Amino acid sequence: MITDALHQIVVHRRDLTREQARETMADVLGGKTTDAQIGALLVGLQMKGETVDEIVGFAEAIRAAATPLIVRDSALDVSGTERDALLDTCGTGGDASGTFNISTATALVVAGAGVKVAKHGNRSVTSKCGSADVVEALGVNINLPAERMAECLEKVGIAFLFAPAMHTAMKYVQPARRELKMRTVFNLLGPLTNPANASCQVVGVYTGQLVEKLAQALLQLGLKRALVVHGWDGLDEITISGPTKVAEVRDGKVTSYEISPEQFGLQRAPLSALEGGDAQVNAAIIRAILDGERSPKRDVVLLNAAAALVAAGQAETMGAAIPVAAYAIDSGQAKGRLRLLVEFTNL
């Protein structure tokens, strides 16, 4: 299948069908391809531009090959009725902004507000510090078996799902990704392949061209509610420096709109005010936010946490969700959730 796919994508610049994409990725994850073929596939897709069908087909193959995380108190009860939302804040990364790990801080705040969070993430591929790097620097043991991750989610209310542990077949892709050192379709697939089958998400993307595309992919993959976001300054989060483009998945359709910080009583700040560093620097920034320090960094986390609370159904609007997120920080609940996470994962 990989040879046919390469001819179609690289030679003829034709799109794959959803089924062809699924079969191609299954071959990749089955170890049936070479590093050169994987590299050609990734570059060819990047040059052609990935379609929604291709993205969905790839995601379906990765989901099928993943180690499932069985959560007893999951998003659905035995009758199939929605009970507790299960949220992920995993984004695409790859925005080259140099900011601290906003989506990881957001996950802790939202967990502090009482939402169950299955934070999917990995080590850095193209940035200084990936979500796995900063979570580890915060004291969390990320190398847990799936059963312990599920238990952590049930008992603590938040778990970090370390992608290499859940997607072991991705070992076939990593050499090509490391050598390419560029954004590829796998940046898009991380947020679409949560092993706990998260029912709601906030997904930051590195270009505005992907906002609606990723929202349509999430819709096809069965997400109940999601917000896909991209800041005007290039941030793959809701930004504090100006407008943010949003595509919201809700009630079986996608709605696009734009938001700005001042709509929610927050002041704009330059992107430089969100600058981070390595894992230790970013961990210190997150601790300061959870300690209640006022800054643009706190404000950008409030914005993103508000979006996550809306996605999880805990608030109808972001305006109503901002005070909920602020209380989770100022009451110490978010900090307490991190403490419990560190304690549980190091037992």
UniProtKB/Swiss-Prot annotation:
Cofactor detail note: Binds 2 magnesium ions per monomer.
> Reaction(s) catalyzed by this protein?
N-(5-phospho-beta-D-ribosyl)anthranilate + diphosphate = 5-phospho-alpha-D-ribose 1-diphosphate + anthranilate
**Would the keyword Plastid be found if you checked this record's keyword annotation?**
no
**Which NCBIfam families did the record assign?**
trpD
Q: Which Pfam families match?
A: Glycos_trans_3N, Glycos_transf_3
The Gene Ontology biological process terms listed for this entry are: L-tryptophan biosynthetic process
Query: What this chain does, per the record?
Result: Catalyzes the transfer of the phosphoribosyl group of 5-phosphorylribose-1-pyrophosphate (PRPP) to anthranilate to yield N-(5'-phosphoribosyl)-anthranilate (PRA).
Q: Which UniProt keywords apply?
A: Amino-acid biosynthesis, Aromatic amino acid biosynthesis, Glycosyltransferase, Magnesium, Metal-binding, Transferase, Tryptophan biosynthesis
**Pathway membership, UniProt:** Amino-acid biosynthesis; L-tryptophan biosynthesis; L-tryptophan from chorismate: step 2/5
Positions bound to 5-phospho-alpha-D-ribose 1-diphosphate: 91, 94-95, 99, 101-104, 119-127, 131
Q: What is its EC number?
A: 2.4.2.18
In this chain, Mg(2+) 1 is annotated as bound at 103, 237
The name this protein carries in UniProt is Anthranilate phosphoribosyltransferase
Show the PANTHER family listed in the entry. Answer: ANTHRANILATE PHOSPHORIBOSYLTRANSFERASE (PTHR43285:SF2)
Q: Which domain of life does the UniProt lineage start with?
A: Bacteria
Lineage at the top is: Bacteria, Pseudomonadati, Acidobacteriota, Terriglobia, Terriglobales
Q: How does it assemble?
A: Homodimer.
- Enzyme class comes to transferase
GO terms assigned for molecular function: anthranilate phosphoribosyltransferase activity; magnesium ion binding
Q: Which co-factors does it depend on?
A: Mg(2+)
Look up and give the organism this protein is from.
Koribacter versatilis (strain Ellin345)
- Which family is this sequence assigned to? Belongs to the anthranilate phosphoribosyltransferase family.
Q: Which residues form a coiled coil?
A: none
Which InterPro entries does the entry link to?
Anthranilate_Pribosyl_Tfrase, Glycosyl_Trfase_fam3, Glycosyl_Trfase_fam3_N_dom, Glycosyl_Trfase_fam3_N_dom_sf, Nuc_phospho_transferase
**Record-annotated residues binding anthranilate 1?**
91, 122
Per UniProt, where does anthranilate 2 bind?
177
Q: Which GO terms describe its cellular component?
A: cytosol
Residues that, per the record, bind Mg(2+) 2: 236-237
